[in-house]
A protein has these predicted regions:
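N-terminal hydrophobic/helix-forming segments and targeting peptides
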Residues: 1-200
Length: 200
């Protein structure tokens, strides 16, 4: 997502900057010396799962990372990120949910490159439903879109402040990315872009 953000922001700014965690910002510089700094920020990470144990039958136990509505997890397809790539899996169970890799032993799962500490995200396609859309991580992706469109809308405008527009990481786990981003930019004013989930 960070690479995509940089690619989409780049045509509308003077430079792209990153913080140490991977947050990315397009910078529109003012011609004014020692200009104030305005930071417009959203987040680009998404909630997910982390593997905590691989069972003898090949399934894996997990914890949630970020805000996950557990009632939607059973039957969900997952993409598990390993050191060597990605592995497809799905969630089984209701009360005691586990990740199923289609394996029958711990050894088979380990042979896929899956280990304790690996993370997983729900694998959901973007779907249009009449005048609405459904997708995983839409809440963060809409914020990213707003950031890009904002920078595009002001690309030909001159400001007496430096404008930083972009997305941070690790919002789902304590807003750490916002902390490092503000440390990098040191803004005089900050604006947060975001949206809320649909009412159900």
């Amino acid at each position: 997502v960070g690479k995509c953000m940089a690619q989409y922001l780049e045509p509308y700014c003077d430079e792209i900057v990153y913080d140490n965690l991977g947050s990315v910002f397009g910078v529109k510089k003012s011609k004014k010396e020692n200009a104030k700094r305005v930071l417009v920020i959203t987040h680009m990470d998404e909630s997910g799962l982390m593997i905590t144990k691989i069972n003898d039958n090949g399934s894996a136990e997990f914890i949630e990372i970020g805000k996950i509505n557990k009632q939607y997890l059973p039957g969900s397809r997952l993409r598990v990120k390993t050191k060597t790539g990605e592995v497809n899996a799905f969630v089984v169970g209701t009360e005691k949910m586990v990740i199923d890799f289609g394996t029958y032993s711990k050894e088979e799962t380990l042979a896929l490159g899956v280990f304790v500490g690996d993370s997983a995200v729900v694998d959901g396609a973007f779907v249009k439903v009449q005048k609405q859309c459904i997708s995983k991580a839409l809440e963060s992706r809409v914020g990213c879109l707003m950031a890009v469109e904002l920078l595009e809308a002001v690309k030909d405008k001159e400001f007496d402040f430096d404008l930083y527009v972009g997305a941070c990481v690790m919002e789902e786990v304590g807003q750490r990315g916002a902390t490092t981003a503000t440390g990098l930019v040191k803004p005089d004013l900050g604006v947060v872009l975001g949206c809320k989930k649909a009412k159900t």
